Amino acid sequence: MVIYHRKVVFTYVRAKRFYHFLNIEMVTDFKSLLPVIDISPLLAKCDDFDMAEDAGVVEVVGKLDRACRDVGFFYVIGHGISDDLINKVKEMTHQFFELPYEEKLKIKITPTAGYRGYQRIGVNFTSGKQDMHEAIDCYREFKQGKHGDIGKVLEGPNQWPGNPQEYKDLMEKYIKLCTDLSRNILRGISLALGGSPYEFEGKMLRDPFWVMRIIGYPGVNQENVIGCGAHTDYGLLTLINQDDDKTALQVKNVDGDWIPAIPIPGSFICNIGDMLTILSNGVYQSTLHKVINNSPKYRVCVAFFYETNFEAEVEPLDIFKEKHPRKETSQVAKRVVYGQHLINKVLTTFANLVENS
């Protein structure tokens, strides 16, 4: 039997309007519960050259390794982003989605807008099936021609709504904080894989790209309406900011069962994506997840995707191939150009948008 860690740690999960206190000492697997990781010791030392020698960092790194190996999803607390900001992001997102449809269409997503902007319910497809959500899609902005012919598909400014008025400024501040947080979590993951804290920050993350999906899931009167079909995230690392009072995100565990990602106020849910699977030489596997909002209430989720450089040729890093050699030839070893991979995903997801544009 593997014990998570020896120190008794208590955290909370909000469910059915009350708090259950969980003794993490007793959690020996993640078959019904996602791990909760306080990363504050990591953040306190993240800019120190000798951070890997700090006892607090070592403990966090061990937890990250266990979570990434066993489930690929975990809650992040102690992340340094204020509850006020996290809640304000969700509050103003609700305000946008409550607007009349005609108002939301002012920032309609189109191919000529670089696939940036608002999409109505049913425009997004996962594995060929319609998803029952509406969303605003945003990407890191870049100068025309910066990424050559591949990048032309996504060229253009993000389309931020004029109502709420402060939304653009709020979200740009939030994006910067999520970018910094993601970089620091990846330093811990790099240590967990046996490298230095900075293995990802050379040719892979010198100029990191990002994607943000601001998603609204309507309340339903029938069960098991698929808000977003089962998928893995195609990027590097995801931070999910979800409503505190509705459980809709489900994660597939090692036994093939779907377990709920019950909201913890003030936390992020973090999960690894396909690019990290490749870079880690398959040590960490991206995990299938889906969204089913069985609540009659409207639910919002703001998902921030931290990515490699747009033009990065993603393949297993040498240090991780050395630390974690693989005997078999697998898909993991194949090189992927991130930007092309992203464009392929966008064009597949919005194939109908292309046809009808």
From Swiss-Prot:
Pfam families: 2OG-FeII_Oxy (PF03171), DIOX_N (PF14226). Its cofactor is Fe(2+). It catalyses: L-homoarginine + 2-oxoglutarate + O2 = 6-hydroxy-L-homoarginine + succinate + CO2; L-arginine + 2-oxoglutarate + O2 = 5-hydroxy-L-arginine + succinate + CO2. Fe cation binds at residues 231, 233, 289. It is found in: Cytoplasm, Cytosol. It comes from the Eukaryota. Induction: By dark. Triggered by methyl jasmonate (MeJA). 2-oxoglutarate binds at residue 299. Disruption phenotype: Lost accumulation of guanidine in response to methyl jasmonate treatment (MeJA). Plants missing 2ODDC23.1, 2ODDC23.2 and 2ODDC23.3 produce reduced guanidine content. SUPFAM superfamilies: Clavaminate synthase-like (SSF51197). PROSITE patterns: FE2OG_OXY. Binds 1 Fe(2+) ion per subunit. Residues 208-308 form the Fe2OG dioxygenase domain. Belongs to the iron/ascorbate-dependent oxidoreductase family. This is Homoarginine-6-hydroxylase 2-ODD-C23.2. It comes from Arabidopsis thaliana. The gene is 2ODDC23.2.
